[in-house]
Amino acid sequence: MQKVSRRHKENFERTKNIVYSNIDEAIAVLKETATTKFVESVELHANLNIDPKYADQQLRTTVTLPNGIGKQVVIAVLTNEENFEEAKSSGGDIVGNDELIAQITQGQINFDLLIATPNMMPKLAKLGRMLGPKGLMPSPKSGTVTSTLQSTLTEFKKGKFEYKADKTGIVHVNFGKSNFTNEQLVENLKALYQSIEQNRPSGVKGKYFKSVSICTTMGPSVKLDLEIFA
């Protein structure tokens, strides 16, 4: 069993049983407890009053945070050959059609996001079982099936990404890195919370948010008072 360091224990004791009502203080504590030697991801965990087994209580949407999330996304584009140049000049890292489908079929998935033009979707249908579980299957709802490659690629290169609630109704999503400034993390956190709030499923009855906490990859949970966003 891996030994837990004294600093690690101290960090968890520091935030245990505390609910932070000041967003600046919460972010400061979050950064102070990110004590590993590598740059950690910063995560939000929002427990929502939804039951995703019902269609009108599902949450799946996209957001562009003001300061990005500190990750360079590799984007693959599946389109006709006449669109290759536009796709490449607009930020597509991997561009192709039938040969790209063949690579994916062989398990060569060297990208974080797949964008496709509508005419390519019938060819992609057979790969749904491979791409779906990885969250890589293009869909109109996520904006990854598009006829406007230039604007779509520009948005995703700027940091647009998709998030969704899991089957228990909890949203787990990164909103930055531990080396971001406090101000950048505050701005991103507020924007992400606002996005979740604005995309409240129509079937939600009563209170929407049950609880919200933030943490770094190896750090303790920092619980937030929901009034912090009022």
Swiss-Prot record:
Lineage: Eukaryota, Sar, Stramenopiles, Ochrophyta, Bacillariophyta
Subcellular location(s) per record: Plastid, Chloroplast
Family: Belongs to the universal ribosomal protein uL1 family.
Protein name (Swiss-Prot/TrEMBL): Large ribosomal subunit protein uL1c
Plastid found in the keyword field: yes
Main location: plastid
HAMAP family: Ribosomal_uL1_B (MF_01318_B)
GO cellular component, one term: large ribosomal subunit
Superkingdom of source: Eukaryota
Assembly behavior: Part of the 50S ribosomal subunit.
Main function: Binds directly to 23S rRNA. Might be involved in E site tRNA release (Potential).
Keyword annotations from UniProtKB, A to Z: Chloroplast, Plastid, Ribonucleoprotein, Ribosomal protein, RNA-binding, rRNA-binding
Recorded GO MF terms: rRNA binding; structural constituent of ribosome
Biological processes per GO annotation: translation
